[in-house]
């Protein structure tokens, strides 16, 4: 009977520590900035900056719907979707006789390199 209060105290302490860690987790940037425009130092020249979209977009995962799972060759329980930092609007420019696409606005959307 005297062991139950000891385990209860340890369990509550562990729960408090886990809750504290969980609250700190979303506030970290993990070394990756949000998706936004940044100047491209290679192609930019004074008076004519060239911008490109850079940064992180986070993926999401969710349980695979049963009807989708039935059509899979190798059924998977988890389905994931990746998003990339892509240009929402672009403007074509010429820098040193090289045609470039200057990004003017960015957002997180479908990764273009996955499309054919």
From Swiss-Prot:
Listed PROSITE patterns: GLYCO_HORMONE_ALPHA_1, GLYCO_HORMONE_ALPHA_2, GLYCO_HORMONE_ALPHA_3
Key words of the record: Disulfide bond, Glycoprotein, Hormone, Secreted, Signal
GO biological process, one term: positive regulation of steroid biosynthetic process
SUBUNIT field: Heterodimer. Glycoprotein hormones are heterodimers composed of a common alpha chain described here and a unique beta chain which confers their biological specificity to the different hormones.
Protein name listed in UniProt: Glycoprotein hormones alpha chain
Taxonomic source organism: Clarias gariepinus (North African catfish)
One Pfam family recorded for the sequence: Hormone_6
Subcellular location(s) per record: Secreted
Primary location recorded for the protein, binned into one broad class: secreted
PANTHER family listed in its UniProt record: GLYCOPROTEIN HORMONE ALPHA CHAIN (PTHR11509), GLYCOPROTEIN HORMONES ALPHA CHAIN (PTHR11509:SF0)
Any one annotated GO CC term: follicle-stimulating hormone complex
MF term (GO), any: follicle-stimulating hormone activity
Cystine bridges: 32-56, 35-85, 53-106, 57-108, 84-111
Function: Shared alpha chain of heterodimeric glycoprotein hormones. These hormones bind specific receptors on target cells that in turn activate downstream signaling pathways. Involved in gametogenesis and steroidogenesis.
Membership in a protein family: Belongs to the glycoprotein hormones subunit alpha family.
Record-linked InterPro entries: Cystine-knot_cytokine (IPR029034), Glyco_hormone (IPR000476)
């Amino acid at each position: 009977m005297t062991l139950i209060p000891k385990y209860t105290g340890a369990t509550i302490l562990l729960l408090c520590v886990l809750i504290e860690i969980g609250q700190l987790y979303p506030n970290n940037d993990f070394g990756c900035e949000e998706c936004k425009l940044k100047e491209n130092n290679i192609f930019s020249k004074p008076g004519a900056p060239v911008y490109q979209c850079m940064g992180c977009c986070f993926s999401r995962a969710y349980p695979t719907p049963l009807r989708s799972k039935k059509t899979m060759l190798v059924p998977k329980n988890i389905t994931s979707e990746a998003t990339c930092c892509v240009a929402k609007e672009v403007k074509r420019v010429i820098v040193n006789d090289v045609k470039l696409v200057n990004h003017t606005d960015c957002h997180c959307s479908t990764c273009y390199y996955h499309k054919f």
